[in-house]
UniProtKB/Swiss-Prot annotation:
GO terms for molecular function: DNA binding; DNA topoisomerase type I (single strand cut, ATP-independent) activity; metal ion binding. Residues 189-618 form the Topo IA-type catalytic domain. Mg(2+) 1 binds at E27, D137. Mg(2+) 2 binds at D137, D139. Its cofactor is Mg(2+). GO terms for cellular component: nucleus; RecQ family helicase-topoisomerase III complex. Keywords: DNA-binding, Isomerase, Magnesium, Metal-binding, Topoisomerase. It comes from the Eukaryota. The keyword Isomerase applies. Its EC number is 5.6.2.1. This is DNA topoisomerase 3. Gene3D superfamilies: 3.40.50.140, Topoisomerase I, domain 2, Topoisomerase I, domain 3, Topoisomerase I, domain 4. It comes from Candidozyma auris (Yeast).
Amino acid sequence: MLISTLPLLLHEQLAQSTRMRVLCVAEKNSIAKEVAKILSGGRARPRNSLYKYVKNYDFQYTFQGLGPCDVTMTAVAGHVLTTDFGPEYAWGKCPPGRLFDAPFLTKPPPDRDQRAGILKNIIREARNADRLMIWTDCDREGEYIGWEIMSVAQGANPRLNLQTTWRAQFSHLEPQHIVAAANNPKALDMKLVAAVECRTEFDLRVGTLFTRFLTNIYKSKRLVGEKEVVSYGTCQFPTLSFVVDRYVRVRNFRPEPFWSIDLAVTKNGQKVNFSWSRNHLFDRMFVYVIYAQLLEGPQKPRIVGVSTKPTSHYKPLPLTTVDLQKCCSRYFKMLAKAALDAAELLYTAGYISYPRTETDQFPAKLDLKGYITKQTLSLDWGTHATRLLQGSFRPPRGGKHDDKAHPPIYPVKSASLDTLRPDQRKVYEFVVRRFLACCSDDARGLQTKVDLQWRSERFTALGLQVTERNFLDVYPYSDWKSLAQLPEFAEGEEVTPSSCKVKEGKTSPPNYMTEAELIALMDANGIGTDATIADHVEKIAQRNYVTRRKIGKSEVFIPTSLGISLIDAFDAILIDRISLLKPFLRRAMEGFLQKISRGEITKQDVISQLLPLYKEAFMESNQKGHVISDTFIQTSRGLS
């Protein structure tokens, strides 16, 4: 028996020795586990790595062009290398200004860092690998982490280089999609790597030197505690500036009185309010002169125009990361970071597509009806999904943005809401309803407009009847309701006012900044990316530059004395220089990073254009450092 099985055993050993060994590395252990499960058909064998929260999954898989391979799927937990200055440039070892020219070191984390175990695991698993496949998130940051993984693996095994490293392109964890990604890998995009390297080094250099400069000033005057850090960030300060600017506008607001003319006509027992074409005026006497002219003499108001025309309320665009954060903040009073964290968990669980995307147009090849079908069993929106498949489906609108990396956010598979945590439940329901709304028809209605002329003044009444709700049936976040139906008026008809009076009002102050408004401003001004905006907002709160406060039904940002003084001080110091507080420099940086990603410019091109501007601002600030401490003292007294 032993002799008869010997040739078979030798054949198996020979096959194993000739099989290629492929090391796959994901950005998170949850992704590694799911991808391994899919590619192995559920037969992956887990074993411990050198970091307790990451497992290694062994299985066999047939890659196109390689035949059957022995595969190990593992993961990292974000970046595996650190970029910093050398020890001679540590805090207290040199003046902050020297960091403008200090070289960078990219190195492994210290042994006490949790990443050390992850890095050692990559080194160990890479030693016997013939190929490396990167399964990090498919964005700029993920590409850079992929390059870090390759660099570490190459140090342990020179065979693993750009030629033998693949990059899996995927946006969700549906099995068919993951298999397609495994069978159609690409090369690492070193242009994206260069863009992240540029942004990392630039932000680290400028952020570190200004942070040390500010902290030294505040501590020298004992304005902050010994362990406190007054940090500067190229995105952080423009974000703070938006909040402070709004706060100042609210505090400095002085209401102004205005006057308007309200006219009402009653016909067939129905009162119809007409709006004055001038809206309101700030000259009380002039309004009363017009009012007196209207009332004198026998001339009656006359209907000069009646029209009824179809109108539409457009369905929403496909969902981007920024829109997800704004909507969750507005509709659910959820912090933007909490919304994004919940979306990340839904993605890693396979419920939605990758939630970090700037794209607001679905690719033509995406099987939209297939994903609608997966929602038909829902008790909450299944009826609407079924209706779409029975003939009500309409192609989604297309926006103007395509990041070329990921489609908009959409539901990949059905989920039972009862099994999800509260934040995840809200986000998942919103993603599904938004997707189904995108695949529905616009809401439709009839708008009636009646124009009335009375002497020299024009008044207008509007009516709206919603005739087809369509996407509104599944998307309760959009409000479009019928107004009172207007009675029939005829052009040329004279009417008798049932009331006409002068109404006095006052201008209203702007509201304090909400998170949804702040995110919209940051997005419009190029501050941060879809993936980082929430972090920048959270950071100004963590640094005690702003506080969150409930006013009425809204949670708003109120700047602290520290936050206000920082903005006021830099405004005063750099009054004739380029501002560190406005979005111009950061917007320019984001534009440059996109150009690096396309291969149009290099990192050095960006450094040579932008760094001198920050250097000039630093030199000016360094000479007038007393303004920073003086402003803080004055602001604190003013708010106390």
